[in-house]
Amino acid sequence: MKGEDGAKMMRILCLHGFRTSGSFLRKQISKWDPSIFAHFDMDFPDGIFPAGGKSEIEGIFPPPYFEWFQFNKDFTEYTNLEECIAYLCEYITSKGPFDGLLGFSQGATLSALLLGYQAQGKILKEHPPLKLFVSISGLKFREPSICEVAYKDPIRVKSVHFIGDKDWLKLPSEELATAFVNPLVIRHPQGHTVPRLDEEAVCKLSNWAMEIILSQRSTNAAPVDTVDETVTNKEEEAEPKEECECEIAAAAAGAGNGIALQRREAEAVEAVNA
């Protein structure tokens, strides 16, 4: 697919949260400034399994609802995870190629796993390396055999991590960010939700996205330049600015824990009512 400027759009696979749906995640993301992902083609599939229990968004957003896999109360044992991974690898291969992943909660957790596995040569060996990742309230898997592979080395993918001050997954989300080389962390005052973005957050995310787009175009669809390992983190609060200057966007225009996870994943309803 091509954008309005005739350039080929980069593709992002977007994975929804537990017992919601692709259409619900699309609605959540729709409250963001549309210019942020104007140069991306975004795909919102439904989870592989129908919801195995009550969805907390019942009465807020219409069914059906889905989940990607199941887990125990401590988020240390997983059911149907391998089947889910196989399904997504087939989806990415048959409907791709994709340039990156975006996910909320269970979807973000799963996306990070796919990125780590691909980096280690475990999956998607014939698919071009995924280049970018948008994580909203994601966390690491806790099963040692998974961690030893997926997070063995820092993941060299351009990543941005949204972390809520009131999110019950705040600390696990911070831990996930450390699994990536030079992550951009954007904090917000909300809870476990796809947050509404203030002007500064919009600017930071827009610049992050446009850096990737411009790098992709300048290398004629080659992989995005490797990230600089000498920089450990790009916390947005590291250097306060009086105003946010979206220089790159302007130039382009010119050119927790598992116990709570199952019970509270559906706080995503905040995304509708916020």
Protein language model annotation of sequence segments:
Residues 124-140:
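A conserved short beta-strand
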Residues 141-142, 163-171, 192-193:
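Acidic catalytic loop of the alpha/beta-hydrolase fold
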Residues 165-183:
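Conserved loop-alpha-helix segment in the C-terminal half of the alpha/beta-hydrolase fold
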Residues 191-203:
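Catalytic histidine-centered segment of alpha/beta-hydrolase-like enzymes
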